[in-house]
């Protein structure tokens, strides 16, 4: 099935897994800094399903309400028990001190409760920034002409869609110093975090 019309975007989760297996295509994603990294593997002689999957990921993703309810509950419980995790609490304080920006503050319980599955999906799509900014790193023996045609077909229209993916505004730095200090402890020289989604 192609993406447009009766495409990958309309498949259920189980059907999508079966479709992926039949087409030998897999995808994983993670957030790194301000970027969302998508890793897609497909057959060298048939890369098209890989682009169909990227298109589906950006334009047709949904979040099941029941799953979102359990994620919400987990976040609320984590918020309530933050005092029991001093390392996380310290990292959060360091984050808030580093940036003079309200977005660094932890969400309150009532804010998490008001967040819907649709809101979560919209936030997820924000991570992609502008589709014009998508950078491809191709590993494999595939002709450039073939790739350009696929990129144009499956991703070229996304930036002109009805729901553009707006880029988020970068956080405002509170200080130009190399490090900030919280409770007489210095910030680590480098801190790198990864989230698997």
Regions found by a protein language model. Name each.
Residues 105, 130, 135-197:
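An aromatic/glycine/proline-enriched structural segment found at the starts
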Residues 14-22, 61-80, 143, 162-176:
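Acidic/histidine-enriched alpha-helical segments
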Residues 113-117:
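A conditional alpha-helix N-cap/helix-loop micro-motif detector
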Residues 1:
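His-Asp-centered metal-binding catalytic motifs of divalent-metal-dependent phosphohydrolases/nucleases
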């Amino acid at each position: 099935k192609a993406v447009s019309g009766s495409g990958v975007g309309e498949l259920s989760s189980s059907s999508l897994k079966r479709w992926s297996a039949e087409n030998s295509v897999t995808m994983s994603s993670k957030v790194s800094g301000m970027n969302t990294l998508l890793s897609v593997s497909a057959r060298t002689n048939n890369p098209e399903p890989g682009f169909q999957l990227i298109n589906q990921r950006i334009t047709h993703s949904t979040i099941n309400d029941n799953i979102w309810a359990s994620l919400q509950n987990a976040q609320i419980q984590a918020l309530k028990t933050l005092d029991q995790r001093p390392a996380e609490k310290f990292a959060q304080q360091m984050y808030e001190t580093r940036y003079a920006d309200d977005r660094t503050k932890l969400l309150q319980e009532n804010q998490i409760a008001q967040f819907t599955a649709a809101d979560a999906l919209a936030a997820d799509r924000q991570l992609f920034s502008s589709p014009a900014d998508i950078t491809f790193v191709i590993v494999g023996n595939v002709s450039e002409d073939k790739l350009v045609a696929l990129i144009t077909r499956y991703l070229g229209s996304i930036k002109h869609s009805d729901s553009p993916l707006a880029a988020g505004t970068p956080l405002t730095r509170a200080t130009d110093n190399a490090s900030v200090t919280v409770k007489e402890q210095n910030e680590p020289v480098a801190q790198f975090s990864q989230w698997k989604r």
